[in-house]
């Protein structure tokens, strides 16, 4: 994305536009390093610290200062701080906008409010966007080499039509995904599932298919998971949904829901489901988010584990990566 923005015309803002856009375009993901602090730290800080309305502006200023100060050593070609800062804002803003468009979401209001913003339009790494950007950058470069071979004059500094076209196509693609997402949600809400009426529905992108969505819907007693085809030749079948039964009310479930970490996890999870099991000296309640398949090998697939004693008093609580629990259970 940074290279496309540079070649689409932002290189005219500064001679260092490309490196500035590249650095600012990836720097926000430094908060993903919280992964190495464990699942609990990852839940708290990823897509938050440097993706928020507080962290992102500070990050833009820090990066702009770094480039500006480095350029001051070259007295013959200094950089204007205002232009560098503008490029940093564009780079970080484009990055955060794409993250908001994913199903993972962003904690824009961190640290003031633990609320996730997500449009559920794109997978974390969308192969179709990557393909469009690559085509928009590589094909003009190939044509340029051919034109040089036949003696055409090289035009320097002009915006690349290929890069502009690629950015326009990406914008149209996201708009089309928004339309498809709305259709998927309406399709989910228009059906009954094994006799149950949906209360809330969500549609999440399938990275392998343009037309298939992971549908998840909440009914009074169950959470249903079903594939939703949109725009293709397949027909939606509500009866093919996989049913997950919610646990009934019990002292153990009620006590687990009141645990501080469980409440924080529920703010993160879109479709939380609790599983209750007896232990030697009490109870264990596991919360997972059905937005993700159970075997989804992504660090965003988190679970909360609440341990209670026989008197339903909180004994331990923690966040885990679902992939680690799956490995231990094998």
How does the language model describe each region?
Residues 1-183, 189-195, 205:
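N-terminal membrane-targeting hydrophobic helices
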């Amino acid at each position: 994305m940074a290279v496309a923005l540079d070649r689409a015309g932002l290189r005219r803002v500064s001679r260092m536009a490309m490196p500035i856009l590249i650095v600012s375009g990836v720097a926000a993901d430094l908060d993903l390093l919280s992964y190495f602090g464990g699942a609990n730290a990852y839940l708290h800080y990823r897509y938050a610290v440097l993706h928020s309305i507080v962290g992102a502006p500070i990050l833009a200023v820090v990066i702009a200062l770094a480039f500006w100060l480095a350029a001051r050593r070259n007295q013959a070609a200094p950089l204007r701080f205002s232009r560098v800062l503008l490029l940093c804002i564009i780079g970080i803003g484009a990055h955060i906008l794409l993250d908001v468009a994913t199903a993972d979401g962003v904690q824009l209001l961190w640290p003031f409010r633990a609320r996730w913003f997500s449009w559920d339009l794109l997978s974390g790494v969308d192969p179709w966007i990557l393909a469009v950007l690559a085509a928009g950058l590589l094909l003009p470069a190939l044509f340029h080499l051919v034109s040089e071979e036949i003696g055409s004059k090289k035009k320097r500094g002009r915006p690349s039509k290929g890069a502009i076209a690629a950015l326009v196509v990406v914008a149209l693609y996201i708009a089309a995904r928004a339309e498809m997402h709305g259709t998927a949600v309406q399709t989910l809400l228009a059906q009954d599932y094994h006799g149950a009426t949906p209360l809330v529905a969500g549609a999440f992108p399938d990275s392998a298919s343009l037309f298939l969505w992971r549908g998840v819907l909440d009914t009074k007693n169950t959470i249903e998971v079903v594939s939703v085809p949109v725009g293709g030749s397949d027909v939606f079948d509500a009866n093919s949904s996989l049913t997950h039964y919610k646990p009934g009310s019990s002292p153990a479930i009620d006590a687990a829901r009141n645990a501080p970490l469980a409440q924080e996890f529920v703010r993160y999870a879109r479709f939380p489901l609790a599983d209750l099991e007896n232990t030697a000296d009490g109870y264990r309640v596991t919360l997972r988010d059905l937005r993700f398949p159970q075997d989804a090998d992504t660090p965003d697939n988190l679970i909360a584990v609440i341990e209670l004693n026989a008197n339903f008093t909180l004994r331990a609580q923690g966040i885990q990566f679902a992939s680690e629990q799956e490995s231990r259970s094998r």
